[in-house]
């Protein structure tokens, strides 16, 4: 069934198979690429890299990302033309971009941007791919800065890249559309601009309509989740309960597109995109288990959300003992002597703050060092390029005099 698709540059067909099968495809392609009898080693190594990269995107596994990097390096060794050299460099840049998306680390982004700016390509499709990579990297940097002007400049680059994306595989063009909509959404929220939010909504509706649930379930789910976030932002600006309800319906529709094992990280992202308090504790615990790779941004966010929900539940039932027990679990984890990834540490600090404040309200005592915990979590999340985790710490910070 997939024989023809396997030879295509468009990896959109992978959306139809689960993460385990993607891993099997990546292993098969890497083995074939390494055979002496392989007639097109460059193409095979590049395809193997793309497959491992897709597996990493679905599961958050560092090992898969490292395998993708090794395959891209092998592809570089087998280049025979300047255009192939550029294509291998673009694949390496895509791996750097995904590593940043999964684990943070702005230094990775800076290095990838420097490489992308120096690319020279001959074929129109390679030039378009280079422009798309550069635009997407700039979009990540703009989102880190949070400055409206930077967001709008990055949006212009994405527009230009999309204009030249007609020669790219559909999945690459869809990535650009999702990034442009996400950027418009973020700029709209930052500027409290309903026009930008509406623009993002139109782009996402078009993407949802073109992404069939029978062929592109993951792209459809990503667009639905972003559209839900946009409606929630509009609801907050306009005070509209109807828009808020529509946003919740879109989140549920996104979650219904696939099962958690099909794409664990997409499932986590959809669940965490829902407004705080709407996601049941059981689902948050499942999200945390699926995102257990050390240092994974989504895993850290899931852990913090689960701890926040545990604190709310224990406080609502007046269970001081449960709060104390949860704090003890975190302390044991932090003092175990094993290396803790910075973002996991930050999530635990925010969780400890939630628990300490809940216990303080129940016992009438002043929680100690909460401000310091949250300040250090904010700084760590900022340094590692995880603005979503930083926002969670800011939201948890008690108002002075409250």
Model-derived regions: residue spans:
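C-terminal non-catalytic interaction modules
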Residues: 1-24, 345-402
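Flexible inter-repeat linkers and adjacent short helices
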Residues: 1-198, 211-218, 396-402
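Structural signature of alpha-solenoid helical repeat junctions
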Residues: 40, 44-47, 84, 91, ...
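Short coil/turn linking the two alpha-helices of tandem helical-hairpin repeats
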Residues: 49, 56-59, 93, 98-103, ...
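Residue register within tetratricopeptide repeats
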Residues: 66, 103, 110, 152, ...
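Amphipathic alpha-helical segments of tetratricopeptide repeats
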Residues: 69-77, 113-121, 155-166, 201-213, ...
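Acidic, Ser/Thr-rich low-complexity linear motifs
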Residues: 104, 125-126, 166-174, 192, ...
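Eukaryotic tandem repeat interaction scaffolds
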Residues: 250-360, 373
């Amino acid at each position: 069934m997939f024989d023809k698709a396997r030879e295509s540059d468009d990896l959109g067909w992978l959306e139809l198979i689960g993460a385990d099968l993607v891993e099997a495809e990546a292993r098969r392609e890497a083995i074939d690429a390494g055979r002496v009898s392989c007639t097109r080693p460059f193409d095979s190594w590049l395809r193997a890299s793309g497959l491992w990269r897709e597996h990493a995107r679905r599961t958050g596994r560092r090992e898969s990302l490292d395998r993708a990097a090794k395959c891209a390096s092998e592809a570089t060794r087998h280049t025979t033309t300047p255009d192939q050299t550029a294509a291998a460099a673009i694949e390496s840049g895509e791996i750097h971009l995904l590593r940043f998306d999964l684990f943070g680390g702005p230094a990775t982004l800076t290095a990838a941007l420097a490489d992308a700016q120096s690319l020279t390509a001959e074929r129109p499709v390679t030039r378009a791919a280079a422009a798309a990579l550069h635009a997407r990297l700039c979009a990540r940097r703009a989102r880190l800065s949070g400055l409206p002007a930077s967001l709008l400049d990055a949006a212009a680059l994405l527009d230009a890249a999309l204009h030249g994306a007609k020669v790219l595989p559909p999945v690459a063009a869809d990535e650009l559309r999702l990034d442009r909509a996400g950027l418009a959404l973020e700029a709209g929220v930052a500027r409290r601009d309903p026009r930008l939010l509406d623009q993002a909504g139109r782009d996402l509706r078009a993407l949802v309509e073109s992404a069939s649930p029978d062929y592109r379930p993951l792209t459809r789910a990503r667009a639905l989740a972003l559209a839900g976030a946009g409606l929630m932002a509009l609801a907050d600006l306009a005070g509209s309960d109807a828009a808020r309800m529509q946003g919740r319906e879109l989140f549920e529709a996104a979650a219904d597109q696939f099962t958690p094992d099909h794409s664990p990280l997409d499932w986590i992202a959809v669940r965490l995109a829902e407004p705080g308090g709407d996601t049941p504790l059981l689902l948050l615990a499942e999200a945390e288990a699926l995102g257990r790779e050390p240092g994974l941004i989504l895993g850290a966010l899931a852990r913090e959300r689960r701890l926040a929900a545990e604190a709310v539940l224990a406080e609502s039932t007046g269970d001081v003992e449960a709060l104390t027990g949860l704090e003890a679990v975190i302390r044991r984890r932090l003092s175990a002597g094993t290396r803790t990834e910075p973002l996991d540490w930050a999530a635990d600090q925010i969780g400890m703050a939630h628990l300490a404040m809940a216990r303080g309200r129940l016992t009438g005592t002043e929680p100690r060092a909460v401000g310091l915990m949250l300040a250090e979590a904010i700084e760590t999340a900022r340094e590692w390029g995880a603005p979503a985790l930083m926002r969670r710490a800011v939201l948890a910070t008690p108002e002075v005099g409250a």
